[in-house]
Amino acid sequence: MAPPPAVVAHPLSSQATGLDMVHEFNQKLTKSDEHTWESFKFAPIRESTVSRAMTRRYFEDLDKYAESDVVIIGAGSCGLSAAYVLAKSRPDLKIAIVEAGVAPGGGAWLGGQLFSAMVMRKPAEQFLEEIGVPYEDEGDYVVVKHAALFTSTLMSQVLKFPNVKLFNATAVEDLITRKDAQGNLRIAGVVTNWTLVSMHHDDQSCMDPNTINAPIIISTTGHDGPFGAFSVKRLVSMNAIEKLGGMRGLDMGLAEDAIVKRTREIVPGLVVGGMELSEVDGANRMGPTFGAMALSGVKAAETVLEVFDTRKKQNQE
């Protein structure tokens, strides 16, 4: 049985307090006219109802997205920006986002050195305007008062799209590959597992993964780290690319332009964006400025749209 359609609750009025709303609900539930918190009562529920509500929907999503149109690895600022553009441009596409962390957002919850404000160089403010994030205009750059405002807004916008599913606390352990008639490698999906399982392959055995097929993947896993630069490191180990360039030292002026310009399909079926690119090309790191992450995601989405029909046809062969 399909879950019921989502219901959006609207406040009683701009002056309504939490107690007013509780009172209205309690009148419906208990027929009580008491206007106090002491009369408050939740609707009844059984524990198994909660379990079934969660598990049924999750396994329906696993079934639905086992064949996806696009898989995005990494739900940082670049991956979420790509998901937003794709979902808005092509509501017919099934888009699965796979994020190793419990909390999506990557490093975009704070600015540099755990400070609050987020800096973006122009013209990245156009993306802020698109998703409805207010900012202070400082001439050549803009400042969002707290990085979490950008990340939470972008995340909520993405998750509202009916054609997007976020699988967080889920790691990509490998890439699904195919070869064409000429023997050239093409990426055709991802191999997944619970992140906590992925972290314990050294001390536990026989923990096989799951898979998601898709004609094209966007990898935005960040610079080198435990889960970072995953896809491009895997390409090296399977001899699909010769070696990584290695991220260079910090140069904001060079780094942001390079990341956006070089966002591309590295091998057929795999588009790479964000700081993962710096490991491929030997680009500079950019430090605590976030415009390139957002716009690299936008370009990654546009790149997918350009090649999607071709990759989908190949995926059916």
Curated annotation (Swiss-Prot):
Co-factor remark: Binds 1 Fe cation per subunit.
GO BP terms in the entry: mitochondrial genome maintenance; thiamine biosynthetic process; thiazole biosynthetic process
Major enzyme class: transferase
Sites where the protein binds substrate: 78, 99-100, 107, 172, 208, 223, 275, 285-287
GO terms of molecular function: cysteine-dependent adenosine diphosphate thiazole synthase activity; ferrous iron binding; iron ion binding
EC number from the UniProt entry: 2.4.2.60
Subunit organization: Homooctamer.
Name of the protein in question: Thiamine thiazole synthase
Annotated organism of origin: Yarrowia lipolytica (strain CLIB 122 / E 150) (Yeast)
Taxonomic lineage of the native organism: Eukaryota, Fungi, Dikarya, Ascomycota, Saccharomycotina
Encoding gene (name): THI4
